[in-house]
């Protein structure tokens, strides 16, 4: 199988699981062959990839032909064989660039979002006709793609779960974070993700307000997407009288080190497509509690390697209380989760599967 020139493409302004997966693909693939990356300048992903050789394209939602022309020229100049894009809003730019280029590269999309409606209009049929492969991050996403995209234009759909890797976090680093947040012997409940309503931080705050008598603190990790929502969270903390139990860390690149603080990690999103944070917690030997829908259903076996809840604060409070009272159960679930993450979601194995798909196009 000959080496191919790959291009990772993402103009998203954010830095969440999707964008971190872009960075992980680029950092891994470039060690195994020719791989370049195109990002939007001065956005969070650009800053996260500090010191890397990046190609810059500004998104233009009113005149998409402008970034598409720039991308087409880059494709031809760099002899790109495969364009791998991730953000759904990039689909028009990438497809138009393929049409405008002389090289006519293969296109693969990593689909990180659910699909909920039929794509049978002329525009979407044209888009999908020009995409060669879609990488679905779960079997649920694969089923949705094959249901909603007309069969005569539906690209080949391949399922490869996302992966994560175990980092060597020194105890000294963990202790420094404990000191920073004034943590001692508390039971730590963590939630990692962008500060926006859909991530469900408010559910965790409400759940903890029902457990005031317990020695619990909550560490909320993530950068703010919605300032009004952040202020509403802080007001809820005051109204529920749990100011002494809630810590907002803000954005950090040291997510794994922060997870080492946790006894339990929560995913409270209503319809998480995959849940990268779930496997990140598992590989850090942190017990997971996640909503019983979407991607977590393909990751967690309830009561075996984690717990699922119905996204009510009452049910979450019960699950947290159960693990607080039963250290043996908590540690057993965490260990089983760790073993599953190493076996089924190890980054190098998952990246290799995806890379082989790209090379085979």
Predicted feature locations:
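Short hydrophobic beta-strand element within catalytic cores of glycosyltransferases
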Residues: 38-39, 287-290
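Glycosyltransferase donor-sugar binding loop
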Residues: 38-43, 192, 217-231
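A conserved mid-protein helix/loop that constitutes part of the nucleotide-sugar donor-binding site
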Residues: 16-24, 187, 191-210, 214, ...
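A conserved, positively charged/aromatic
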Residues: 30, 105-136
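Aromatic "clamp/platform" in nucleotide-sugar-dependent glycosyltransferases that forms part
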Residues: 251, 270
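N-terminal strand-loop element at the rim of the active site
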Residues: 8-66, 146, 155-156
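Conserved acidic donor-binding segment of nucleotide-sugar-dependent glycosyltransferases
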Residues: 302-303, 307-314, 322-327
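A short, active-site helix/loop in glycosyltransferases that binds the activated sugar's phosphate group
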Residues: 131-156, 164-166
């Amino acid at each position: 199988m000959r080496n191919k020139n790959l291009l990772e493409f993402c103009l998203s302004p954010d830095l969440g699981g999707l964008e971190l997966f872009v960075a992980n693909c680029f950092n891994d693939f470039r060690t195994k062959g020719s791989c370049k990356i195109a990002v939007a300048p001065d956005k969070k992903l650009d800053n996260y990839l500090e010191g890397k050789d990046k190609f810059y394209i500004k998104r233009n939602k009113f005149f998409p032909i402008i970034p598409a022309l720039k991308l087409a020229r880059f494709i031809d100049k760099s002899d790109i064989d495969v364009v791998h894009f991730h953000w759904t809003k990039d689909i028009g730019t990438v497809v138009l660039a393929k049409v405008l280029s002389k090289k006519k590269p293969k296109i693969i999309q990593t689909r990180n979002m659910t699909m909920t409606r039929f794509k049978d209009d002329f525009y979407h049929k044209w888009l999908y006709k020009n995409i060669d492969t879609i990488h679905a991050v779960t079997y649920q996403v694969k089923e949705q793609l094959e249901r909603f995209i007309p069969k005569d234009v539906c690209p080949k759909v391949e399922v490869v779960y996302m992966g994560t890797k175990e980092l060597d976090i020194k105890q000294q680093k963990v202790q420094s974070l404990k000191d920073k947040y004034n943590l001692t012997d508390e039971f730590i409940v963590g939630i990692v993700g962008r500060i926006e309503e859909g991530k469900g931080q408010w559910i965790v705050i409400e759940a903890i307000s029902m457990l005031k008598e317990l020695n619990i603190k909550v560490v909320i990790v993530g950068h703010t997407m919605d300032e009004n929502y952040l202020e509403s969270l802080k007001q809820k903390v005051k109204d529920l009288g749990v100011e002494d139990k809630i810590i907002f860390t803000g954005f950090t690149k040291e997510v794994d080190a922060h997870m080492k603080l946790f006894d339990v990690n929560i995913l409270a999103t209503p319809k998480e497509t995959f849940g990268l944070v779930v496997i990140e917690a598992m590989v850090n030997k942190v017990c997971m509690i996640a909503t019983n829908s979407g991607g977590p259903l393909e990751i967690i076996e309830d009561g075996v390697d984690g717990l699922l809840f119905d996204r009510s604060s009452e049910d979450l409070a019960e699950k947290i209380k159960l693990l607080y009272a039963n250290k043996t159960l908590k540690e057993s679930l965490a260990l089983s989760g760790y073993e599953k993450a190493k076996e089924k979601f190890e980054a190098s194995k998952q990246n290799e599967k995806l890379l082989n798909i790209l090379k085979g196009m």
